[in-house]
């Protein structure tokens, strides 16, 4: 069993991005600039945004954090989005989800200029990805692809089971793994909360992407020997073992599943670091206008 070390791979990509940023500066050009909007005080969102800002600093990016209280009205947020759309100094920006319930996430996402949508959530980017055109790929699916690529996992002709159908992970990674490129050319089965015989599907899988958001959903009796398992789950659970009083738990019961795997990603330290670095790479692509001129 090989542990897929997302931290180590992300560190390699950091070096690659840092060199590109240094060259941009040497050429007398503007550093990549990522902005983030955070509404409210959700603990997970606070942590994620702090990590993104920290990574920007490490890479030599410029970053801007815009904070609002949870009682922010929708129109004010939409006005901020439009301001960022028009700001030529901002290469890309994200809106940290989830938003308070009184704000329509879809309406806000659709208000973003798709050329600055480095999260890859805008319908234009989602549609272009679906038909194989250049676009900003959502960060978590992009990170998963990079793990498969860096560990040289064979995907062509393999049966991949995706557990979960969210717009952020499940649907896009299923689409990407079907594309005519590496990593891809998989036969993909998407399972979700209404799927019958999930056990049967999982036992037939060569690759499993676990993104249900259910702690330890995938157990040892659900996988065959030699399977590749990528755990996307990051549920915060109470714990007396940590100073913070909680720990992250993945969608895979690691101790049972890992011995049967050829490759497996851990939680934490697997997909998480890859997600953040993939967002940074999207920001660099936006700065260089590689995808959209």
Swiss-Prot record:
Swiss-Prot/TrEMBL keywords: Amino-acid biosynthesis, Histidine biosynthesis, Hydrolase, Methionine biosynthesis, Multifunctional enzyme, NADP, One-carbon metabolism, Oxidoreductase, Purine biosynthesis
Reaction catalysed by this enzyme: (6R)-5,10-methylene-5,6,7,8-tetrahydrofolate + NADP(+) = (6R)-5,10-methenyltetrahydrofolate + NADPH; (6R)-5,10-methenyltetrahydrofolate + H2O = (6R)-10-formyltetrahydrofolate + H(+)
Biological or metabolic pathway of the protein: One-carbon metabolism; tetrahydrofolate interconversion
GO CC terms, sorted: cytosol
Keyword field contains Transcription: no
TM spans (from-to): none
UniProt-annotated binding residues for NADP(+): 164-166, 193, 234
GO biological process, one term: tetrahydrofolate interconversion
InterPro entries for the chain: Aminoacid_DH-like_N_sf, NAD(P)-bd_dom_sf, THF_DH/CycHdrlase, THF_DH/CycHdrlase_cat_dom, THF_DH/CycHdrlase_CS, THF_DH/CycHdrlase_NAD-bd_dom
Annotated function: Catalyzes the oxidation of 5,10-methylenetetrahydrofolate to 5,10-methenyltetrahydrofolate and then the hydrolysis of 5,10-methenyltetrahydrofolate to 10-formyltetrahydrofolate.
Record text on subunit structure and interactions: Homodimer.
Family classification: Belongs to the tetrahydrofolate dehydrogenase/cyclohydrolase family.
The protein, known as: Bifunctional protein FolD
């Amino acid at each position: 069993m090989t542990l897929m070390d997302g931290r180590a791979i992300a560190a390699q990509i950091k070096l690659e991005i840092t060199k590109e940023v240094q060259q941009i500066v040497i050429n007398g050009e503007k550093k990549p600039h990522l902005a983030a909007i955070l509404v409210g005080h959700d603990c997970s969102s606070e942590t994620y945004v702090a990590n993104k800002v920290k990574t920007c600093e490490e890479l030599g990016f410029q970053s801007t954090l815009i904070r609002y209280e949870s009682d922010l009205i929708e129109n004010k947020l939409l006005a901020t989005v439009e301001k960022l759309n028009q700001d030529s100094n901002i290469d890309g920006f994200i809106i940290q989800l989830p938003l308070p319930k009184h704000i329509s996430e879809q309406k806000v996402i659709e208000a973003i200029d798709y050329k600055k949508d480095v999260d890859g959530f805008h319908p234009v980017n989602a549609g272009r990805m679906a038909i194989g055109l250049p676009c900003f790929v959502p960060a978590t699916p992009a990170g998963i692809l990079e793990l498969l690529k860096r560990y040289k996992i064979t995907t062509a002709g393999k049966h991949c089971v995706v557990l979960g159908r969210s717009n952020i992970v499940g649907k896009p990674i299923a689409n990407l793994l079907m594309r005519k490129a590496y990593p891809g050319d998989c036969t993909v089965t998407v399972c979700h909360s209404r799927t019958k015989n999930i056990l049967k599907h999982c036992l037939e899988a060569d690759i499993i992407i676990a993104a249900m958001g259910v702690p330890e959903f995938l157990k040892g009796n659900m996988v065959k020997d030699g399977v590749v398992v990528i755990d996307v789950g990051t549920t915060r659970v109470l714990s007396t073992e940590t100073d913070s009083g909680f720990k992250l738990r993945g969608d895979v019961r690691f101790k049972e599943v890992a011995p049967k795997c050829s490759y497996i990603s851990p939680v934490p330290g697997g997909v998480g670091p890859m997600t953040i670095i993939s967002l940074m790479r999207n920001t660099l692509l936006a700065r260089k206008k590689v995808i959209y001129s």
